[in-house]
């Protein structure tokens, strides 16, 4: 697709003056700027206007264009992408940020109160500690207001002074030349780092920062039922606020060690209980460990391996107080690796019988129990 004539793009004749070119560009650039225009092809038109101005505003490029057209204008001058600059470190984005609320926008008061940073602390608990909860005293490295200068950063007996360069505003005005004329931008004052205040005599303890690094002891209550990976928020125990703002928060992340017998799924506790073939086949009553103590569990005769039994209320308490979980006991048959001659004979007898009677079951039970 052939390019349009640059003079036509800007709506000008070939004899247009530099001032006319600048005015036309300024009007069209504002009209087609993507942040303002709702036209469907605004971006393409904006780029076209930008490219035309880049050539016609430069005497050498304009002369090449007038003599050779687009081929001459593009010879040795590179492309005309959206990131082109006018020179002097001031580009198109700077110009339009000034027009549409960028550099000239309202800035935050540098001396306004601000909340301190949040902190994170990792803690590892045993399985039972997570179930029943625990109270901990932890030491956290924090930045607190300096006791010597009371957080001002100034040497005791002295005070901060208003910055003369920005009159205490924390901002200074910077003028820059653009194709649209002079633009005044506001930026942070380099003399006071945007605070509006100067510390002439710094505190020797904190060296003017107003803060010192220290370790603070904090009491943390771990709620019953907390699970691995959950965190506790301790309000106001983070870093100190700035300019009188509130302190941040402390987040305690909990890790729970694995247990050799129990596993956890939400508020429920899972365990596997090994039983003998005789206990599964003939039934039995066994003691099952729980985090609340041992309980009796009746195993019905003919129980299959993998059967799950529920012990109501023997799980973990819900961390938010919504009831109590259960414990699920999965029974697994344990095949003996060493059998006596009597046990082997009874098993062979059992395997050879099509119909079992009570006398055989009794013999098996006594044999596996060593009676």
Swiss-Prot record:
What is its cofactor?
A: Zn(2+)
Look up the signal peptide feature and give its range.
none
Q: Does the keyword Zinc apply?
A: yes
Q: Where are the CXXCXGXG motif repeats?
A: 146-153, 163-170, 189-196, 203-210
What the entry lists under HAMAP family is as follows:
DnaJ
Record-stated family = Belongs to the DnaJ family.
The protein's name: Chaperone protein DnaJ
Q: Which organism is it from?
A: Bacillus cereus (strain AH187)
Q: Which gene encodes it?
A: dnaJ
């Amino acid at each position: 697709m052939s390019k349009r004539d640059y003079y036509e793009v800007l709506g000008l004749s070939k004899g247009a003056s530099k001032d006319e070119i600048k005015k036309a560009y300024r009007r069209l650039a504002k009209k087609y700027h993507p942040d303002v225009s709702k036209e469907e092809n605004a971006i393409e038109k904006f780029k076209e206007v930008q490219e035309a101005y880049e050539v016609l505003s430069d005497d050498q490029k304009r002369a090449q264009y007038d003599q050779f057209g687009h081929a001459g204008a593009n010879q040795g001058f590179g492309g005309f992408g959206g990131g082109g600059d006018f020179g002097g470190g001031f580009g198109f984005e700077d110009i339009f940020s000034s027009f549409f609320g960028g550099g000239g926008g309202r800035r935050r008061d540098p001396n306004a109160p601000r909340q301190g940073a949040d902190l994170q602390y990792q803690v590892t608990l045993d399985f039972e500690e997570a179930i029943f909860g625990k109270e901990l005293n932890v030491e956290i490295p924090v930045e607190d207001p300096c006791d010597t200068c009371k957080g001002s950063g100034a040497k005791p007996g002295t005070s901060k002074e208003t910055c003369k360069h920005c009159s205490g505003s924390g901002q200074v005005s910077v003028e820059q030349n653009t194709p649209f004329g002079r633009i005044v931008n506001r930026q942070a004052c380099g003399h006071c780092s945007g605070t509006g205040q100067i510390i002439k005599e710094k505190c020797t303890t904190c060296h003017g920062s107003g803060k010192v690094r220290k370790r603070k002891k904090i009491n943390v209550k771990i709620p019953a039922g907390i699970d691995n990976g959950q965190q506790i928020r301790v309000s106001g125990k983070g870093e100190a606020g700035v300019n009188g703002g509130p302190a941040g928060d402390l987040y305690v992340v909990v890790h729970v060690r694995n247990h050799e017998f129990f596993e956890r799924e939400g508020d429920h506790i899972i365990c596997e209980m090994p039983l003998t073939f005789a206990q599964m086949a003939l039934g039995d009553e066994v003691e099952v460990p729980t985090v609340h103590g041992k309980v009796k569990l009746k195993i019905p005769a003919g129980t299959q391996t993998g059967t799950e039994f529920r012990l109501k209320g023997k799980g973990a308490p819900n961390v938010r107080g919504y009831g109590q979980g259960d414990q699920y006991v999965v029974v697994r048959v344990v095949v003996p690796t060493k059998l006596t001659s009597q046990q082997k004979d009874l098993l062979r007898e059992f395997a050879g019988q099509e119909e079992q009677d009570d006398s055989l079951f009794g013999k098996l039970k006594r044999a596996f129990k060593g009676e």
